[in-house]
Amino acid sequence: MLNNILKIATRQSPLAIWQANYVRNQLLSFYPTLLIELVPIVTSGDLILDKPLMKAGGKRLFIKELEQAMLERRADIAVHSMKDITISFPEGIGLAVLCAREDPRDAFISTHYASIDLLPTGAVVGTSSMRRQCQLRERRPDLVMRDLRGNIGTRLEKLDKGEYDALILAAAGLKRLDLAHRIRMIIDPTELLPAVGQGVIGIEYRLEDTHILSILAPLHHSATALRVSAERAMNAKLAGGCQVPIGSYAEIEGDQIWLRALVGSPDGSLIIRSEGRAPLSQAEILGQSIANDLLYRGAESILCRAFQVDS
């Protein structure tokens, strides 16, 4: 830390700033005299809004500039939505802390309709997530899926202007920005499986800065980390990114961890699902096992087609 000031790299969107301030306030509750400064950064993902995320370069577009700021020592840590953090890290960067998970589910937002089932044929649903599009197309093939980029406020404005009949957004982001009143329906994971790490704030740090890791330690939530480790182990085995719809959600039940996962074709015509339970100590092994089962059931062909198109 330069001049004993902890510098937090963050994107400039309202949700990202909220998350960075959340981390700041949590740290101050443990260390009232700690000096903390936010370092807002515009990322490539914030600038490229005219094409789907998978065609623009994937989720690294939202984090690479923040990681670069850390490597250049313009920032000490970086705060992200965990679902945006890729499986691999640049040399010298690692994952320090996972904060307690907010609501991991997706939310249905509409000005005229109370639920997905009440949308009329041909209704336009806004979401850029292939995972959401795939599962919605399986459930309602008569709906029109349209990409939607930008921060939460921009997306809601487009809905209010009538450009979309409904939106699907992460419930956690809406709740954090005091926009829960816009939610018409929370979608159960049995109907729409969340993304890996959804609802979790993750903090990256420089591996050499062990003193910063110790400062961050009180923010770490072990149960959340266990759940996300299973989800990310599954994703890593599948080499999942933005090229193919992948959903994964882990829950703790007593001394067991329960993991559900899916891989789907973008058009929703084929979705491969798997689930399983294991002792808490085998969370990552469970994730790998579920990935292998998905591959055995036919996910490999979906992944191969996606990567061929992407290349």
Curated annotation (Swiss-Prot):
InterPro entries: HemC, Porphobilin_deaminase_cofac_BS, Porphobilin_deaminase_N, Porphobilinogen_deaminase_C, Porphobilinogen_deaminase_C_sf. Pfam families: Porphobil_deam, Porphobil_deamC. GO terms for cellular component: cytoplasm. Its cofactor is dipyrromethane. It catalyses: 4 porphobilinogen + H2O = hydroxymethylbilane + 4 NH4(+). The keyword Transferase applies. Its EC number is 2.5.1.61. One of its GO terms (biological process) is protoporphyrinogen IX biosynthetic process. Pathway: Porphyrin-containing compound metabolism; protoporphyrin-IX biosynthesis; coproporphyrinogen-III from 5-aminolevulinate: step 2/4. Binds 1 dipyrromethane group covalently. Keywords: Porphyrin biosynthesis, Transferase. The modification S-(dipyrrolylmethanemethyl)cysteine is found at C242. It is an enzyme of class 2 (transferase). Monomer. The porphobilinogen subunits are added to the dipyrromethane group. This is Porphobilinogen deaminase. It comes from Baumannia cicadellinicola subsp. Homalodisca coagulata. The gene is hemC.
